[in-house]
Amino acid sequence: APIYRKGRTPDMEVIGSLLQNYYYPFHERLAGALNTDSIEIAFDCHSMLPHSPPVRMDAGRPRPLFCLSNRGDRNGKPQKPGSLVTCPPVWLQALARSFQAEFDGEGRVVMNDPFRGGFITVAHYRQRRTPWVQVEINRGLYEAEGREVDEARLADLRERIFSAVAGFWDEISR
């Protein structure tokens, strides 16, 4: 879907300013933060609508609680032999199990569907080979009716996500 309405695309001066003031500094700071041996995995976190939007082929389809992505298939494995994944499949599978255990009975945790990971995960994985996972969080977990953020639900969600990530790290660190 287009970002700008027809006839409202910014001119080259505005585009250059946006790149200089936001895009380049963001990616430089991110690369700098990863320029250490102490970072063992990185997460690119987003929120997703509870249902697919009308512009998608699967419009109205309920979305999972979490979508964990490494550019692979629905098991976290490469789409085809030799294709890029940004996190080892066994790690992504362990992370999915940990999230599913933490949110048992509340909904699905899936890998690479409806999202497979995007520019940030690929670009920054390629720089240092630090594993990257894109995490999509269903807004229904923390939004009340009318799209207002429920602060109590959000605080609980933070704790549970931390618990899921800690459980994952404990499992793969054994």
Residue ranges and their predicted role:
Residues 1-174:
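N-terminal catalytic or cofactor-binding beta/alpha core of small enzyme domains
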